[in-house]
């Protein structure tokens, strides 16, 4: 039967489209969609339940209620198909047409569409150049608008209220024309000549210089040109005909109680029809104007609430005071059409159950309950039963399954073999949250999960549930097996490290078996091979941890060598463990206590050296072995395992004495309360650390005599210590709370309580201590809940901005790249250069520092062997390709991306790197903190370091340094960005330090230094002013008690001058600026080198001068010191909020002020509360900026600054960095800042992922000069469009476009994407759709999201080939048929038009 119908069905070509075009629907188009006019507000007859004729559910308009049966029942059956019944007028056809046939309502008066009126910026308002308020007054019948002033002094589009209108009519009669309501607006829009208007705007643009005016004009210009180009007519923003949704999409369902459940839309439509009909009647009766006007206004309001309830005026509510859901509400938000039905659907063939551990499974297996499998694989079972002739029909097969016949279980066994299923655990934060396994049928009702897969799913067995999905088609099964099988996902896509790593019990077991124990049974025995060791161990002759000698196969570190037997000194456990090592892996990897890190390194090495298969087998074996020996170890935990250190009491007594001393000083008035607080906190946090250190020493080390009678130390076998040391569970910080002291606690406002909790959990807390600690515990729980939601939202925004970044080609051919060097924090190399460039492609060759030859050519993929060469070459910076500089237009190329982290080879075409990047950054989001850090105590003391002490031997290298030599012959730094690096003998950078202005260096550039040597010193508490030339000091504007204050130093008794702040000076001295000038022996001012400008040192408020007028000054002397306020420490935003701020490109509260041009600094006249800083460049350009007085400036009069240098401290704004220092610096800044946040939490993310997001944030450019293109100067455009246009212009020898990149936050960038479908499904649906339809946008369906929404394969992975094939076929067709036929296919699909030809806008 079905096949018959399918044959008759006309084949729908609507499926075959390549673009979607959205535009405004003209009244004629709306009528053409309609199957009839809805004239009555009635819905269905309450007795017969049949729809009323001409009503909202009318069968004549919308189609029959039952398949192939007219309403009155005259025609039934398929044979009458297509007949229109002459009694009831219903066409005999399928009832499903009631889901697609639309109706319409002819409105008695035009009505404005609220989206184009109220959605900001108001499109109608922009076109007419009126404010929204003015238009509303016209539309809602408060004012008249002058349409044609005629010969009167009235102006066009002037608004007149009732009285003014009457007055004008009395004065001028019918000379002028004024109207009100939507008719007036429609009339104006209809008679608008867009070409002339555009001409006018161009003329106005050339005439005006006002910024705001230009902005407004540009907006109007853009709107008008796009209206003109897209073929949308402005008057279509006013509705004459209202389309009616098909009735099955707004159903009316009778309930048992005789009441009806109805969609809100029906109520809204009824109001429109009622008011429309009433208005028609009033117009026929020629009712008084005021009544008609009121009715028209009510009709306008009814249509408004139907389209978007609540956007204007009161929200229309239903019977239960709940706002009615209008058409706009249907599509927006989480419950709207986009996010609820199009992007996420519920799927068939799925089930869910609790998970339990499956320690006997292999990595690619999962245990599936039989009952569940039976339900999931039903269709396959039916097929098997029928083909093997157990059953003749589907019905019979169904019966067999219901009766549980034995054949059914055989069938299940057969169909499940080699058929992978997919397991998913919510929340799916990254792609490893869904993996494929081969099912093993089990009894019971819980799914068994392999323990090693837990880390990827973030699953534990405390009641977690997982869902099972069955891939049905052959292709789906194939992809599940090759791409999603858990054994194919060993490495994490975020950082390329193994994610299949033993944890907890397994680690403990492996650690226990590889430890050494002195004096163990059988120590010193020798064995021929491992088998002999095994026999000896099983017979109880040797202990697991005994040190023995045994012959083992030996391989080189890199896996070469024959595996010759070598006598090795090791332990029994390690020898046994060596049995599971794959052939070719060196024994040295396990010849140590196997802590978690060591196990991870072993798996990583195995993967890199021997490949996937060996690694999977090794991981499984490690798991079985780990569980076995964890059981044998009998590790348990008891109160006696928590050893409280003996020294604790003594340490506490010492600290209490120190605190008493500080209290005493405070009481004597030597300390302020803030200083006291900081010092006390400092003491206690130090005490906590000391106790913890002593505790770990006592807990972790045991002294005993060995066989030779010597006293030796060995690690203890204390259970608690072993668990923490191996990395199985717990950390030093937690043990510290168990057996050390709990330490300092925070108050609810975040400040730290001065009295710490000195007890630990083993000793027990008293009531007060317990009460203090409750706050922290509760805050932790509240934080976690908030964090999850915030982290999820961040991931959603990231995915949305990067969803269409796909690898589309192999090589884009660019020669550009970014510079990468090691990451250094506080002098230590935190991330080595090798780690940062692993898996990248070189953009410039690497030159060997020792020989000067090319060590690695450009275009090399840096894998492990190449990294070894790189390290030998002794370079400390490398240029590599990056997605930031990739020249591919749509997507990125494989060479710029580099290695696919999850597979370990160059990335393949079709990989959705954007989504992977978003997931890698978003997934650890829940581990980040939510709160801002308060720096107190320990952190503060660390901040006041005043010297550089070297940790390694090497050669000192200075970079970015300006120095002068002082009278002692030492170098003094006079630059702010100076750095000191220590280079080792191989030419590698080992340490890097920033040197502040005024640091005194004890060494010269290139000098050899020894470990522990102090290279530079400075005073961390003051900021010096250093003389760069010599001369006699001469004071200007130094007036005691007016501009300066004299006091004597308490220690030395010398006179000290302090510059007074403006607020402390008398009014007469407000403009005086104290400065020190240097004079030569003739008494003339000394000028700075190469210029005529005298050297003046202006002194800011608070500066302290230790000189006298007329003192001799040498180069490098300190003229004055500016005290640093170290007490005022701001909180650093950390964790998630910081990451969100960076990705949203938010401007910091007090951004650093950067130099806009290169030149010389001078100070202009001060204004109230602000100082004026002027930079004069060499070519005569001048840049002025007003800076608040309280901002501390980094520069002095006469200093040279480079463009982009920091003038006043603060967090630099990313927009400034991009503008002044360029894209590379910006990328470096964002990557560095985000990595800092994640590194604090110990999360590793590859830089590439952050770069992908940055690339998306830089998608837009600002047009500076449009050249001979259709762009407008000052507008923002997509970079790819601009590049395309420039190619075209250059080919025609026309002027190209000049532009500069702009940075957009991720939310803004998602909404500004080329694809309106993707943007609408993200946020602000109404605004996006309104804008898109006015501009007549075309969605090319390039991204992933758009294709999911229209129900296609995504253009990534295996879907990329499908899309490229389609494109090629289409190009061929177009080539063969010419473009004549392609226009016929253009078919309007609602307002969303699916077009097959290239749009005119391309």
UniProtKB/Swiss-Prot annotation:
This protein's name: DNA-directed RNA polymerase subunit beta'
Single GO term (MF): DNA-directed RNA polymerase activity
Highest taxon above the source species: Bacteria
Chain positions recorded as Zn(2+) 1 binding sites: 70, 72, 85, 88
A Pfam match: RNA_pol_Rpb1_4
E.C. number(s) listed in UniProt: 2.7.7.6
Family: Belongs to the RNA polymerase beta' chain family.
Stretch list, region Disordered: 1373-1402
Keywords linked to the UniProt accession: DNA-directed RNA polymerase, Magnesium, Metal-binding, Nucleotidyltransferase, Transcription, Transferase, Zinc
Subunit structure: The RNAP catalytic core consists of 2 alpha, 1 beta, 1 beta' and 1 omega subunit. When a sigma factor is associated with the core the holoenzyme is formed, which can initiate transcription.
Keyword Iron among UniProt keywords: no
Any one GO cellular component localisation term in the record: DNA-directed RNA polymerase complex
Record-linked HAMAP family: RNApol_bact_RpoC
Binding site for Mg(2+): 460, 462, 464
Cofactor note: Binds 1 Mg(2+) ion per subunit. Binds 2 Zn(2+) ions per subunit.
PANTHER family: DNA-DIRECTED RNA POLYMERASE (PTHR19376), DNA-DIRECTED RNA POLYMERASE SUBUNIT BETA (PTHR19376:SF54)
Cofactors that this protein relies on: Mg(2+); Zn(2+)
Binding site for Zn(2+) 2: 812, 886, 893, 896
Gene Ontology annotations of biological process type: DNA-templated transcription
Role of this protein: DNA-dependent RNA polymerase catalyzes the transcription of DNA into RNA using the four ribonucleoside triphosphates as substrates.
Reaction equations catalysed: RNA(n) + a ribonucleoside 5'-triphosphate = RNA(n+1) + diphosphate
Enzyme class: transferase
